[in-house]
């Protein structure tokens, strides 16, 4: 996804599901996240400590809601940036009022879809496979999907590919050694032979991983099933 605004902007978004609920969670990420807390609730709390505060519209002085305020200074946050989390009552009007006020804060804008995860990736907090795992976890509808998504979000695929990368680097080092000691035939041939063995083992391992009949995709996407039969035999029920 291409984001049209610069990553220097401070972004905000409703992180909980849209609609009526008990609690609405709004996140703010960027250089001005701490200023947002100061503007709405007079002062920011201690890092990673939830406090109950009045949230006030700085333009009118009117009360938006009472809610929990959390402050996560970067880089120790999901995005790696300064991050604020505001938890308010989950009525549509409350969430809309809070988002409206945040939109008036200079330097702040509504986040585009996936932008929080994109910033986490850009700042080295997650890799692409973990970002995909988080998306799958949010979309999971079955227990099997949940377990698979948690494994990927937890870095299982990342650690596997890092191990493959280490083996490739080792093989490359052996080839470079063979080049450096090309005048010593025994050393060069031995290094090349070891490199070939490493690459062959790695190819077999990658092939075995890929040759799984797309089980992971099937678990994630589910099955398409056709119910066929004569009319009025119970297909609908």
At which residue positions do the language-model features occur?
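Conserved G1/Walker A P-loop phosphate-binding module
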Residues: 20, 24-29, 39-43, 176-237
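A glycine-rich (often HGG/GG-containing) alpha/beta subdomain
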Residues: 1-147, 151, 155
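Long, non-coiled-coil amphipathic alpha-helical linker/lever segments
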Residues: 125-209
